[in-house]
Amino acid sequence: MQVIVALAALGSLAAPALGFSIPRGVPVSQSMIDVKLSSTGNSMVKATITNNGNRALNLLKFHTIMDSNPTRKVSIESEDGKEIQFTGMMPTYKEKDLKPSYFIFLPPKGTVEHSFDIARTHDLSRGGKFTLKAEGMVPIAEENGTEITGAAKYHSNELHMTIDGEKAASVENAFGIVKRGPLTRINKRTSIDMQSCGNNQELQALTAALKASAQLSSMSAQAVSQNQDKYMEYFKDPQYMQTVQSRFQAVAQESSSTTGGGTTYHCSDTMGGCEEGVLAYTLPSQNEVFNCPIYYSDLPPLSNECHAQDQATTTLHELTHNPAVQEPFCEDNGYGYERATALSAEKAVQNADSYALFANGKLNLITLMLIDPD
């Protein structure tokens, strides 16, 4: 299936821009990219990405079919139409200062292939017939550049596979069962794995981020019904107001619960998921959240810039990925302000960054800084 590619000049951003943000008003060109899925083994899948256009493209790998991390690249349904549980990671990437190594260069008419084993991130031990498909959006930079100037939406073909369950079960899962140290409920909120906190500074930063996440989420829940223009900017359709409000309330509860939360939060990476560029990640199948070193070194506790990344809203973002907070848990359908606000209402209400960006809006930031300047 073909993909619509959007390109724009570098200086044409009409709103605060992040590394993954897609400029507003971007002109839509002809279909230029093709994504095809094929089976190359029992549970092995090959994605073939072809540039059908006449200009070279630099494609960002993060949160796409080309991501080298064990992220959700395809949706998988069994023969009876049930979705197969995803057991991989949902990372939050740093959106600024993107490196050339984060991109794949695709010359005109060029093709790149990316293979992955779906048994590493899904339980396929029952075996049988499955249907796979992939869809998403690839941020694009100009040739030899790293500043995002456009995006390509993609919808792959449907791939039908018959999988041997015993062989699939023999594939090592990308993440085993998380081993925790002693757990402590700081102010009776989400459990913090104390053994993962290498120093007191990390624990203090995480505790402060959870406090800010609770406050921002609580204020956002109120803003959903009090500021309809702001709500519509991010979530598009009034019919989802109650869903959005209840999710913010659930995140606020999880961040500062008086009855005990359902997630475990780790100050540091104990599962090996902190690859380059990852700020934090969640294992939704286990309700576990992990911070990475650059969460502490590269993010402020709370940004005074609207729609910028910080520790508080990164933590809020991660908590929306956990089914113990609210089901169905949020996906990564659109990253950054421009991509998030371009989603359909159905996609936005299930998009983690839509909640983080809404909470990080100017009104909430000013209010939080006034009531909690420290």
Swiss-Prot record:
This is Probable neutral protease 2 homolog TRV_05367. InterPro entries: Fungal_M35_metalloproteases (IPR050414), MetalloPept_cat_dom_sf (IPR024079), Peptidase_M35 (IPR001384). Belongs to the peptidase M35 family. CDD domains: M35_deuterolysin_like (cd11008). Residues 1-19 form the signal peptide. One of its GO terms (molecular function) is metalloendopeptidase activity. Zn(2+) binds at residues 317, 321, 332. The active site is at residue 318. It is an enzyme of class 3 (hydrolase). It catalyses: Preferential cleavage of bonds with hydrophobic residues in P1'. Also 3-Asn-|-Gln-4 and 8-Gly-|-Ser-9 bonds in insulin B chain. It holds the Pfam family Peptidase_M35. SUPFAM superfamilies: Metalloproteases ('zincins'), catalytic domain. Its EC number is 3.4.24.39. Binds 1 zinc ion per subunit. It is found in: Secreted. Keywords: Cleavage on pair of basic residues, Disulfide bond, Hydrolase, Metal-binding, Metalloprotease, Protease, Secreted, Signal, Virulence, Zinc, Zymogen. One of its GO terms (cellular component) is extracellular region. GO terms for biological process: proteolysis. PROSITE patterns: ZINC_PROTEASE (PS00142). Probable secreted metalloprotease that shows high activities on basic nuclear substrates such as histone and protamine. May be involved in virulence. Gene3D superfamilies: 2.60.40.2970, Collagenase (Catalytic Domain). It comes from Trichophyton verrucosum (strain HKI 0517). Residues 20-189 form a propeptide.
